[in-house]
Amino acid sequence: MNGFSAAWLDLREPADVAARAPELVKKISEWSGRYEHVNVADLGAGTGSCLRAIAPHMGSRQSWRLIDRSGVLLDEAAERLSKWAYQRSLSARVEQNIWRFIGKISDYSVVFEEQDLATGPVDTGSVVDLVTVSAVLDLVSKEWCTNLTRWCSEKGAALYTCLNYDGQFHFTP
């Protein structure tokens, strides 16, 4: 996978937010309602935009693993999530490398993991209910995608993918 700068991710984030399918976000919201606590692995997390986009629509207790090969982007994610939490009146603290963002009805735990995902997700033995992959699948091989779906199946995890482009255009009059 290619590296991206935080500046580039900043430029595309408003368009990415607008491009997310609201019906899929609604389905995630409904699905997450079955869980008291949802455990999410965000692959290719970048600056954490997927968390910021869908976490408010999910259950009140969530644990996120933001996984990216770039420690620089993960550092940016921590900074941006702190600002995001402040804007939502969530208190923020760090306990043993686990970031906590807590509000009246929300409780988010976030761990930042620097991993090279070139061969697929690395299993750390953590419980995973949902895997998110945003703007990544168009950068990886068919084999990588097959490994991802196999990993999700083995974990019993749901898979949310978005913002992927296959390079094809279709026009109709």
Predicted regions and their residues:
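Short conserved loop adjoining the S-adenosyl-L-methionine
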Residues: 119-125
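Conserved S-adenosyl-L-methionine
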Residues: 44
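A short, conserved alpha-helix within the catalytic core of class I
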Residues: 139-152
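Conserved class I S-adenosyl-L-methionine
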Residues: 160-173
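Class I SAM-dependent methyltransferase SAM/SAH-binding core
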Residues: 54-119
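Glycine-rich SAM-binding Motif I of class I
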Residues: 48-52
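A conserved beta-strand element that flanks and buttresses the S-adenosyl-L-methionine
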Residues: 132
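Class I SAM-dependent methyltransferase Rossmann-like catalytic core
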Residues: 1-35, 47
